[in-house]
Amino acid sequence: MPCCLWAALSLLLAVVGAGAWTPPRQPLLLTPRHRRHAQETHHLRLLGWDLKLKENKAIRSPYYKECQFFTGRVLHEEGSAVTVTECDGQLYGLLQVGGEEFVLQPTRTQEKHVLRRRDVTHSERSAEYNLTGDTVIDLDLDFDEDDDLLPTSHVHPRHSDHSDKEYFHDMHLFRRPASGVKGLWLELAIVADNTMLKFHGRERVKHYILALMNIVSAIFNDPSLGSNITLVINKLFLYEDKDIILKYGNIKKSLEAINKWNYRHLMKLPEGSTGWDATIWLTRSQLGGPSGFAPVGGVCTKTRSAAIDRDEGLTSAFVIAHELAHLLGLTHDGEGNCQSEALRGSVMAPTVLATLHNFAWSSCSKEQFHAKSKKWWCLHERSTDEGVELGGAKELSNYVFTMDEQCRTEFGEGFSVCRSVKVRSACSRLWCAHRAMPHVCRSKRAPPLEGTPCGQNQWCVDRVCEPMPGHSKETKVENKHTPEWGDWEEWSACNADCGYGLRTRTRKCKYRGFVSESACEGAGSQVATCWAGSSCAATRDIRSDLCHRQQSRLIPYLHANESNHCEISCVDYAGGSPTNFGALPDGTPCSYLRPFDVCFQGTCVKGQCNSSDTTCNWCPDGYCNNNTNTYTRLLGNGWTRMTMVPHEARQLSIHIATPIPLHIALRERKRDKPILELSKHSKKFDISSLQDNYLKYDPSVPQNLQIVEMDSNILDLKESFRYEGEAITAGTLLRWNQTDTDIYITSESRLQTDLMIMAIPVNPTLEDAVSVDASVNYSTPTGRTRPLEYRWSIERGPCSASCGGGVRLITAQCHRDQKCPPPRYESCNTHSCEFVWASDDWEECSSTCGSNGVQERQLFCVPSNASMLSRREFIKHSVSPVMCSSSKPPHRQPCNRIPCPVYWREQPWTPCSASCGRGVSRRPLTCPASDELLCGPKPRERRRRCRLRRCPSALRVAVQCPERDHAHYCELFTLEQLHRNCEVPPFRKYCCNACRDADRRQHRRYG
């Protein structure tokens, strides 16, 4: 680095440390504003640097016409780059010199600027956006003339008569240099629906969208992509009324609808306007799928160039960049390549993990970007339309969003910055809390935006709260009116009837004689766990019930991160990724091991075990029943039951030693419970990379003594991997690790149902049975002892008669024949010796109508003198049917023999009436009865339009074309793209030969 730059840097640090730098009174840009021309060169002296600037004529700014844009370099500094924006005498600039970045910004004081060096640091992982399945290859669009898909906008789109020439009007040919595209222009239309305006406000939403898209521009201009791409906002649509475009809950239908909307807007543009290359539709509504959805490779087309994104705060910029990349043709990382970069959170990873300080494009994305860029013919030149150009620099935002506004944007209504927890720096991470629960703070693990106010005359710069230019650190002046907290009120009653619940208390903030909700620092309410006084009876697992309500095959899933323990997470029995269904109800235990920790508004409130609670204090004196069992099982080719663990078992440990690889499964002893295979919920680990010793359980040692043997040779040295996993079943969390020779299954909390352990060989083609050893150890609470009770042992002899009344002898046995009572007799079999048929109630009819309905009843042979009123008495006194007469009462009779109503039935849609072009498809109606009069009046058949491929035209096939097409890119289009684009006359003119060849192939296909 030259010596003059060192001097400049030294002076720079001195200026930054001393405060703001005041430029000369004369304008920094030498040419007055009204006399600027694109070919003129401007010089700006900045400390020891000489900035050579040139106005960028291609940049248009209809929304902020008072701004002008310049680009250039620092003289005598190789590889330098400068971007400067002037808005009413205020300068915003980004300087890249010697591998470092410097930001030039105005202060709040007029005619004062500050220059800062950016030291970008890496932040922690951000919130996750799972975008798996966020793409579609083709869309099913049907453009009917009577469709009304253009709702009235308060930022009106431009309309004109329909013209097919507008999309290719004044299109200049562009030949891509061999070294790559030198510059790309991606012109965008941004649509914000009524949910965006309702949340952000009509005036504020414009600034918010520009700030959001500035972040997107910075992502695309990151050095890891090497794109040299410029984003231009060509059109901004704001809809105040609820639109009819989005199909809420069906993201694919919504994507098809907005692409149809986009097509109609492009077709209605005035002649001479090229429109835009892609459209971003922003909404805060639930999409019913990923946070974004886009057609792959749809840019530069009219029918597939729109993407939909859900606004979840400024971090949604990474989702927008992700979907824009899909429109450009980029695919997900990890789909065959760049798996490691996807796991680190690249922009095109299926699960996006990124922050404003930590994002990068993978090598696969970079390779795809530059390989596909030659096909983006619409991006090779800037149009003549007006638009807001986004430079991609990471300078501080021009529009200041306070921390409260950022919290509301990220988490929703009612959220503001958390004030109940003291943090070292408010700029290191954005913490937010809801006004109903101010003591519970949440974060998406990202810092506030650059330039966010963090105190009086202070703002956030590189995650540090620093004084604004022109201000130094000020000491706080003692205020006579200091807000003060009042005393805490009494705790509320425990909200649980049994077990553990929650109680709350509040305090009020007093300021200037009034009660204030925000003047005092700290929390105005507290929540704590409480003991209701008695344990609850055996209850069901609420997590299992909630997952079962969503789908019968779902079981609970417990995240490794404790901060997510109060979320309803479920996973399929057959494995796969967990799905989140919101927060658990208040009062639900946070985990299975600590039932005294209780969930409240999605956050776990820690508690303590009550000494009288038998759920957690189940072994108070240390004397518990320890159960140890060993088994040897012979395995065949099917599932074999290894053992059955009873409910109420705690501290469970199972060890299975096997000579062959096994599949292990768990099954609750309940009806209709599917088998849970451990292999479907396991992860593979490389043993050679692990340095842990493995626990070898000795079944002869009671587990409650917690004695284990450390043995590093328990695994066969030939094995190179093992499997680990966990799952929730039988109301407890089970963990396991498995190799080809050993399986360990453990659980600490109580089993709510009996649990069956089963095994099957991995390769079930055994000729001989294989012997497998299993040891099971668990503990149960010691039952209460009862006082000794001594009773006589009574024996009854046989009855002297089988019916009609008899007697039998009763004798008593006692110890050593002492104090034995004398024998006695009792009557027996007093029922009559005559038996009759008794009938039960008629059952329900087998049909509600028709000619086949029958109903049945059950017959019993019972004594004639028995008085029985219930079915239970019939069964108790019934005897063999041979004791009754052969003439039985009827046990079956016809019922509901009435005609059934019949209705007209719709048949499947008929094929299209035309083999090509437009036609009609109908849905016939049939009457299932023999006479159509029984079905009533025949309703009108439903009809719909259908359209197949365009009918081939002999005139088009025979059309005369020049020797070569006018445009070099015609040969790059696929056959499907040619079928669509050749409908536009200007395109057919430029690509005459390509369109004629496509018509001939289609003519041969249909001919």
UniProtKB/Swiss-Prot annotation:
Regulation: induction: Expression is strongly induced in hemocytes during pupal ecdysis, and at a lower level during 4th ecdysis and pupal stage. Induced by 20-hydroxyecdysone in a concentration-dependent manner in the cultured wing imaginal disks, but not in fat bodies, of day 5 fifth larval instar.
SMART domains in the record: ACR (SM00608), TSP1 (SM00209)
The keyword Membrane appears for this protein: no
Residue positions with a glycan: 130, 228, 561, 610, 626, 737, 777, 865
Disulphide bridges: 338-364, 494-530, 498-536, 509-520, 912-946, 916-951, 927-935
Motif (Metal-binding): 322-333
Signal sequence region: 1-20
UniProt keyword terms in alphabetical order: Disulfide bond, Extracellular matrix, Glycoprotein, Hydrolase, Metal-binding, Metalloprotease, Protease, Repeat, Secreted, Signal, Zinc
GO biological process, one term: pupation
Name of one Pfam family that matches: Reprolysin
Record-linked InterPro entries: ADAM_Cys-rich, ADAMTS_ADAMTS-like, ADAMTS_CR_2, MetalloPept_cat_dom_sf, Peptidase_M12B, TSP1_rpt, TSP1_rpt_sf
Binding-site residues, Zn(2+): 322, 326, 332
Gene Ontology MF terms: metalloendopeptidase activity; zinc ion binding
Domain TSP type-1: 482-537, 833-899, 900-952
Active site feature: 323
Enzyme type, top EC level: hydrolase
Cofactor binding summary note: Binds 1 zinc ion per subunit.
Function: Involved in larval molting and metamorphosis. May degrade extracellular matrix (ECM) and basement membrane (BM) during the development of organs to allow degeneration and remodeling of tissues.
Protein name: A disintegrin and metalloproteinase with thrombospondin motifs 1
Species this protein is from: Bombyx mori
Source taxonomy: Eukaryota, Metazoa, Ecdysozoa, Arthropoda, Hexapoda
Originating gene: ADAMTS-1
